[in-house]
């Protein structure tokens, strides 16, 4: 259905007008004043409403589920530092023990080679 509204002007006169959906496109609308008689309509007369809202909600629920899964997979569980930067970064991570695993230079080189492969 097309919503009808009543506007108040500065002179307190009532001026009825309608906002119509032109050509069944949700972004196209027009304002008409005066008496108008609708002779025909085309397109989907049930566009919008509860069905449309439910589709939008379903879409965004799925999108948020996807984002949540991606965030959970990206969580950092352990931080391993190689070199002398441990003391500098420990304050940044609220005193968290950053070196739960010890990596020697030899192990570091082996890991680098595997990563580059």
Curated annotation (Swiss-Prot):
Q: Which residues bind ATP?
A: 72-75, 84-87
InterPro entries (alphabetical): ATPase_NBD, Hsp_70_fam
For the keyword ATP-binding, the answer is yes
The membrane spanning regions, by residue number, are none
Which segments does the entry list as coiled coil?
none
Does Nucleotide-binding show up as a keyword for this record?
A: yes
Query: Sorted alphabetically, which keywords does the UniProt record give?
Result: ATP-binding, Chaperone, Nucleotide-binding, Stress response
Pfam families to which the protein is assigned, alphabetical: HSP70
The GO molecular function terms of this record are: ATP binding; ATP-dependent protein folding chaperone
| Tissue distribution of the protein | Detected at higher levels in caput epididymal spermatazoa than in cauda epididymal spermatazoa (at protein level).
Q: What is known of its domains?
A: The N-terminal nucleotide binding domain (NBD) (also known as the ATPase domain) is responsible for binding and hydrolyzing ATP. The C-terminal substrate-binding domain (SBD) (also known as peptide-binding domain) binds to the client/substrate proteins. The two domains are allosterically coupled so that, when ATP is bound to the NBD, the SBD binds relatively weakly to clients. When ADP is bound in the NBD, a conformational change enhances the affinity of the SBD for client proteins.
Q: What does this protein do?
A: Molecular chaperone implicated in a wide variety of cellular processes, including protection of the proteome from stress, folding and transport of newly synthesized polypeptides, activation of proteolysis of misfolded proteins and the formation and dissociation of protein complexes. Plays a pivotal role in the protein quality control system, ensuring the correct folding of proteins, the re-folding of misfolded proteins and controlling the targeting of proteins for subsequent degradation. This is achieved through cycles of ATP binding, ATP hydrolysis and ADP release, mediated by co-chaperones.
The similarity comment for this entry is:
Belongs to the heat shock protein 70 family.
**How does this chain assemble?**
Interacts with PRKN.
Q: What is this protein called?
A: Heat shock 70 kDa protein 1-like
Organism for this UniProt entry: Mesocricetus auratus
